[in-house]
């Protein structure tokens, strides 16, 4: 971590710029691609050249804003996309999660989101980068007109799906600031590193459906996840998590199907992350 901070000090001039200004400096006249399809985004994130532009100083772990550029077979510039890059070397030790595992958990959370068909987490991959292996996630432009401090308590289908997903993921850190409202009405969840603990740790600001029945579509999606845990999804998670964490995910899915209700807060531990935003 010390070497990351030392190298980061050299970028202080860049870090004082806005995200748009950082992007303009790095692009040197090139254009960031518009909205990308899922497969294209994942390919560019995995295979494109990753350039760190600046550090996002509000994050607790080393988190960088970067650009990934896919080059053609002739070496010419291709698609350029903005991303968030979180190197494993920059993860702060935590008391209740193993060291160096947060990036894998973020990628695993995206895998579950993809399997659900709900598209709740931006495209996310594991890859090498300037500071070593880590997580790269497609940068999402938010709708600045939406105040999540107001919206987070709404009874909206988008937030309700997120609450179901977080119950499957055992998300211990669903803050309001980890929800990104997009201009097309979707709400995506980011900063999903504190997921998949074996013991119950659900901490979220989305408790408005606590104890209520899951609807038929939610039950169907959770059941589909359960089926995929026996095949492709289970294999994906097995490459990113421990066997105990994969088994615990299956148990959470089974529990949701058995009770067919949103979970209740545990009175013996904090139910809301701090700070909540």
Question: What residues fall within each predicted segment?
Answer:
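Juxta-kinase regulatory segment immediately upstream of eukaryotic protein kinase catalytic domains
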Residues: 2-45
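C-terminal catalytic region of ATP-dependent kinase domains
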Residues: 3-10, 98, 182-277
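Short, flexible coil/linker elements and helix-boundary hinge sites characteristic
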Residues: 13, 29, 173, 260-261
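Short low-complexity stretches enriched in small and charged residues
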Residues: 21, 31-36, 91-95, 142-147, ...
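Short loop/turn hinge sites at secondary-structure boundaries
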Residues: 38-43, 47-54, 170, 258-270
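Conserved ATP-binding subdomain of kinase catalytic cores across diverse folds
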Residues: 43-154, 159-172, 176-177, 182-192, ...
């Amino acid at each position: 971590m010390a070497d990351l901070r030392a190298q980061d000090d050299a970028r202080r001039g860049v870090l004082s710029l806005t995200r748009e200004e950082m992007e303009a400096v790095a692009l040197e006249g090139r254009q960031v691609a518009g909205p990308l399809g899922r497969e294209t985004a994942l390919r560019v994130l995995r295979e494109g050249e990753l350039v760190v532009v600046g550090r996002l100083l509000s994050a607790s772990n080393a988190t960088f804003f970067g650009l990934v550029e896919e080059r053609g077979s002739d070496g010419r510039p291709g698609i350029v996309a903005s991303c968030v890059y979180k190197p494993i070397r920059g993860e702060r030790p935590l008391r209740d999660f193993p060291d160096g595992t947060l990036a894998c958990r973020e990628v695993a959370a995206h895998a579950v989101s993809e399997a659900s068909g709900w598209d709740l987490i931006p495209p996310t991959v594991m890859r090498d980068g300037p500071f070593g292996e880590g997580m790269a996630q497609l940068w999402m432009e938010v709708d600045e007109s939406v105040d999540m401090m107001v919206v987070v308590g709404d009874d909206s289908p988008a937030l309700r799906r997120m609450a179901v997903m977080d119950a499957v993921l055992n998300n211990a850190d669903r803050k309001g600031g980890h929800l990104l409202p997009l201009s097309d009405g979707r709400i995506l969840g980011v900063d999903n590193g504190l997921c998949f603990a074996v013991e119950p740790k659900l901490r979220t600001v989305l408790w408005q459906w606590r104890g209520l029945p899951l609807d038929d579509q939610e039950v169907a999606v959770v059941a589909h996840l359960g089926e995929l845990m026996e095949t492709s999804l289970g294999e994906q998670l097995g490459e990113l998590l421990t066997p105990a964490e994969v088994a615990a995910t299956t148990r959470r899915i089974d529990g949701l199907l058995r009770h067919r209700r949103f979970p209740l807060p545990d009175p013996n531990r904090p139910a809301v992350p701090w700070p909540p935003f």
